[in-house]
């Protein structure tokens, strides 16, 4: 998917990009490839692949969820900024917080946000388990996103405490998500969530499977969650 195809594909979904936004995506790609030579940000560096598997894939959530209804977003373990920064470029009104435990990724994201001229973007170098117990952030976000390889039961413990009551947790998964959801149902309920919607679709060009789950926060997460760093991964609630 080249930049022109990317622009057309988004326009077909109702997302019209300005010249400024297209330049932001171009600069994002260039910085990603440049910095990737110094640090391991992504295995995907080909332009067409980046536009499809990072940019388009991140924004695909907006085909099913109305981001104009949200004000604050927290992205847990965003790595090189996915999915939150491509979403932020498309929806500039959003106030975005990104949490990641690797300091070098924070350095990249800081430089990237400055280069792209992104405002209302904040980066936190922290473990998700610690961040979720921080009163300044706990149950403060309209939407929390995760596009990660961790199991859904683990992601739920890391992300649900950050979602405000009435807000949403958006899980982006590749294949075999249904099986994961079944093992995560106990955890989702325990942390105050309810699975509201599931969208299954294929990425264009390569037709790889994608799943998006929208989990609504119906009640507060018990204070003891998330547990200490490392525990959710070692002893997932399933």
UniProtKB/Swiss-Prot annotation:
GO cellular component, one term: cytosol
Localization of this protein: Cytoplasm
Class of this enzyme: transferase
EC number: 2.1.1.-
InterPro entries: rRNA_ssu_MeTfrase_G, SAM-dependent_MTases_sf
Function: Specifically methylates the N7 position of guanine in position 535 of 16S rRNA.
This protein's name: Ribosomal RNA small subunit methyltransferase G
Origin species: Listeria monocytogenes serotype 4b (strain CLIP80459)
